[in-house]
């Protein structure tokens, strides 16, 4: 704590007025951790549209965070439908996420955020936070209608008028049958009658053939014993089949089977496809060979361990520096105990790659912050 205060005193914000509460250990450890905060403000979140199920959160107007270069930046705290956050450049850093408490205290997974006199509703098109867009400042006055038209969230009043298109849709009367539909119905009736006639004529022909007696059966049995090979049209071939002909037929069949196996796309995968899959196998792959071929595409990953702020800053810089090598970045996360919610160890960050070649190249050129170590691994599903 003393080191943080000395570093803050040497920065450009050391001349600002600070109170004992703002520089206390409890305030620094509160979310967002390891940051100095000013201007606390309470907001309400109502879960399941139940006025009795409301949680009160403390958000901050200004947040001071430390970078890897031991410099301090001052940013405004913001809030949207997903939680409270601040921006590190263009990167959103959420220190409160309402979705976590919605799973604990709610049943429907729906909530409303009440900031002063405004209510933040869920977006219609997407429920995932967009980086750098769709944010609402927590200390701003009631905004203008132009600023409220946001891409990922929308701040609106509680009274809403239903769209007119819905009323027209449900009050629309069914259209009367036209001449086109009448013709189609007649054609369908004629087709059904033709099908019934054909089935009756076919059944009669089968009955007449069955009455033919034993002579036809004997004649057919003789023809079958003489020429067992039949063509496509049901006609017999010339003369009996010899032993040499049967061998040639078996050879041709084996060749056709081998050709069909060789032309199958499941025969193997090219080196370029290794590491291209980012999903685990489904139930359709029952054979062991198919599973091995699919599992060869499992993407490799690197697990980073270190301080949360260092990992976030590294991720922000790595997206620009290693954008051709790293395929996906995860958010920072931590392990918790099996019997408690206390965090265990340092924060984690996962980096996913398309192939082992890209991961090896990344390892050769990567520069990790001090105090951050790494390990290799593979995942069946990203």
Curated annotation (Swiss-Prot):
Gene Ontology biological-process annotations: DNA replication; DNA-templated transcription; regulation of DNA replication; viral DNA genome replication
Main location: host cell
Post-translational modification comment from the UniProt entry: Phosphorylated.
Annotated disulfide bonds: none
Pfam families: PPV_E2_C (PF00511), PPV_E2_N (PF00508)
Composition skew (Basic residues), residue ranges: 250-260
GO cellular component: host cell nucleus
Region named DNA-binding domain: 298-382
Keywords of this entry: Activator, DNA replication, DNA-binding, Early protein, Host nucleus, Phosphoprotein, Repressor, Transcription, Transcription regulation
Subcellular location(s) of the protein: Host nucleus
Ranges of compositional bias, category Basic and acidic residues: 163-175
The keyword Zinc-finger is assigned to this record: no
Domain of life the protein comes from: Viruses
Chain intervals for the UniProt region annotation (Disordered): 124-282
Biased composition (Low complexity): 261-270
Compositionally biased region (Polar residues): 146-156
Keyword set includes Transcription regulation: yes
GO molecular function, one term: DNA-binding transcription factor activity
Region (Transactivation domain): 1-127
Family matches, as HAMAP family: PPV_E2
Similarity comment text for this entry: Belongs to the papillomaviridae E2 protein family.
Record function comment: Plays a role in the initiation of viral DNA replication. A dimer of E2 interacts with a dimer of E1 in order to improve specificity of E1 DNA binding activity. Once the complex recognizes and binds DNA at specific sites, the E2 dimer is removed from DNA. E2 also regulates viral transcription through binding to the E2RE response element (5'-ACCNNNNNNGGT-3') present in multiple copies in the regulatory regions of the viral genome. Activates or represses transcription depending on E2RE's position with regards to proximal promoter elements including the TATA-box.
Assembly: Binds DNA as homodimer. Interacts with protein E1; this interaction greatly increases E1 DNA-binding activity. Interacts with protein L1; this interaction enhances E2-dependent replication and transcription activation. Interacts with protein L2; this interaction inhibits E2 transcriptional activity but not DNA replication function E2. Interacts with protein E7; this interaction inhibits E7 oncogenic activity. Interacts with host TAF1; this interaction modulates E2-dependent transcriptional regulation. Interacts with host BRD4; this interaction mediates E2 transcriptional activation function.
Protein name per the record: Regulatory protein E2
Gene (UniProt): E2
């Amino acid at each position: 704590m003393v080191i943080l205060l000395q570093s803050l005193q040497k920065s450009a914000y050391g001349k600002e007025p600070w109170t004992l509460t703002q520089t206390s250990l409890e305030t620094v450890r509160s979310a967002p951790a390891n940051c100095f905060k000013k201007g606390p403000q309470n907001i309400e979140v109502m879960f399941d549209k139940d006025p009795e199920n409301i949680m009160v959160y403390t958000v901050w107007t200004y947040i001071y965070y430390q970078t890897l270069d031991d410099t301090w930046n001052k940013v405004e705290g913001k809030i949207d439908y997903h939680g409270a956050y601040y921006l590190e450049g263009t990167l959103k850093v959420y220190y409160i996420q309402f979705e976590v408490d919605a799973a604990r205290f709610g049943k429907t997974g729906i909530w409303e955020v009440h900031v002063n006199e405004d209510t933040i509703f869920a977006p219609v098109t997407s429920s995932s936070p967009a980086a750098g867009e769709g944010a609402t400042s927590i200390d701003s006055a009631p905004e203008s209608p132009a600023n409220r038209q946001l891409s990922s969230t929308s701040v609106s009043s509680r009274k809403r008028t239903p769209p007119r298109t819905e009323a027209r849709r449900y009050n629309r009367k069914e259209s009367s049958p036209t001449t086109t539909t009448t013709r189609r119905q007649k054609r369908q009736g004629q087709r059904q009658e033709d099908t019934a006639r054909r089935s009756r004529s076919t059944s009669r022909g089968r009955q007449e053939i069955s009455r033919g007696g034993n002579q036809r059966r004997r004649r057919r049995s003789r023809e079958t014993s003489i020429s067992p090979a039949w063509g496509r049209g049901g006609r017999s071939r010339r003369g009996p089949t010899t032993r040499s002909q049967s061998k040639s037929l078996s050879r041709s069949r084996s060749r056709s089977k081998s050709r069909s196996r060789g032309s199958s796309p499941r025969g193997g995968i090219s080196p370029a496809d290794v590491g291209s899959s980012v999903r685990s196998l489904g139930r359709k792959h029952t054979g062991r060979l198919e599973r091995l071929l699919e599992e060869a595409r499992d993407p490799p990953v690197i697990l980073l361990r270190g301080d949360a702020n260092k990992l976030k800053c590294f991720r922000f810089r790595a997206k620009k520096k290693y954008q051709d090598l790293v395929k996906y970045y995860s958010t920072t996360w931590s392990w918790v105990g099996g019997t408690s919610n206390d965090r265990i160890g340092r924060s984690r960050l996962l980096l996913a790659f398309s192939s082992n070649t890209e991961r090896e190249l990344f390892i050769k050129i990567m520069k990790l912050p001090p105090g951050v170590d790494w390990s290799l691994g593979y995942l069946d599903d990203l």
